[in-house]
Amino acid sequence: MINPGDNAQEELQEALILMSEGDTLLIKSGYYLFEDGLSLDVDNVTIIGEGLDKTILDFKNQQSGAQGFLVTSNKVTLKDFAILDAKGDALKVIGSKGINMINLRTEWTGGPKSTNGAYGFYPVESEDVLIDGCVAIGASDAGIYVGQSKNIIVRNSIAQYNVAGIEIENSYYADVYNNLASHNTGGILIFDLPDLPQQGGHHIRVFDNKSIDNDTDNFAPEGNIVGEVPRGTGIIIMANSDVEVFNNEMSGNGTVNLSIVSYSDETDDPNYYPHPRRIQVHNNIYLSLIHI
């Protein structure tokens, strides 16, 4: 168990290193101000706080580490805490088989800025990914991002004031449902890009979501692909196959509610297919236009 205090950072990182498989670590309610990033590389463990508004890990004074919290192990559950103002990505997960992120919050508290970290939730090259009941605010790329992964669920979550609210990129077999994406530049993005180890994104379902009032100016750093997303976009599907979009509400998006597009930049990747295929859109509620 970790309590707030002057030595909380050292105690928490030591506890993360010394955990054994099957352990649960409780981070008690309170405010924790950290100067260094945290990391976890132990399989089959649970890290739990006492609420996403009660256990607060604040990285505004972070001096080292490319992210607030880095996970590189399997069968991990993270639950009931917040990560604020990380120097880079808030919560990054690499190469995990079985990662559960439940009732977590990532936020940059100074409002939308290009100097904010790129990603709130950032699992990549992972399998069996669950993001459930989470909140992502203020990321300069995507609040909730899953990339080059497979067997994914993103549900019951809120993404606001990010460039992209929720983004599934170069991934296979994802269900995105019962989420609220609002006041982002773009609400929900389903992208496939060239020159990555895993591409040909396919079998994505986007349903029972609200992608509404996405009205924040694009604040992505220059050169970032999401910097091309126009303010006021509900859902974009780019270069994926076998995508189904249904039972969503899309409204109050000033540019377009639903856009289905090809990847338009030049690429030398011989294995990349830039056009969307087998896209189904049905039973949605929306205002303004569909652009194909």
Model-derived features: positions:
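Acidic Gly/Asp/Thr-rich repetitive segments characteristic of extracellular carbohydrate-active
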Residues: 1-26
